[in-house]
Amino acid sequence: PVEILRDAWGVPHIYARNMHDLLFGQGFVHAQDRLWQMEFQRRLISGRLAEVLGQPVLDIDRHMRILGMRRVAEQEAGLLKGDPRAKVEAYAAGVNAGITRQPLPVEFTLLRYRPEPWTLADSLSWAKMMAWSLSVNWETELLRARLIEALGPELAAELEPRWPDHWPVVVPSAVATVTDSRSI
């Protein structure tokens, strides 16, 4: 059994007796809060946006199919065994429970379709897309390396934006320690 409680700010708190139930709950919460984002990314990664958005995104689909992230994720899904596989499957089962047990986001109504069941390969694809999207600054890193080579590290550092030492990295009022559900 899993219990999902939301605090006054809508933040979900998942209580479970084992990892399977916890991951099921996490998948369910993700479906509640982010189903359209998950579906859009799944279609983007798979090169299947044009199926619902039409001709204007066909070039994006072609590009994503050439990159082949979905194809690799499907191959990896076939290789995943034992506990790691069970964990990702528990998460997917939670997403699917969320899809079937609650109203769909308005985007599905507007585009007149229902999402397909979430799969292990969908989760692996998502991880690949996230890694790719977080690594797109390679051009900036290459430029930085060229500047260091041409100017030297000290002079190149002068071109970097400065972050004053007295400015916080984390806003103190946003930091909270939760010791039990009453402290929220």
Each language-model region and where it sits:
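Substrate-recognition/specificity elements adjacent to catalytic centers across diverse enzyme folds
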Residues: 2-184
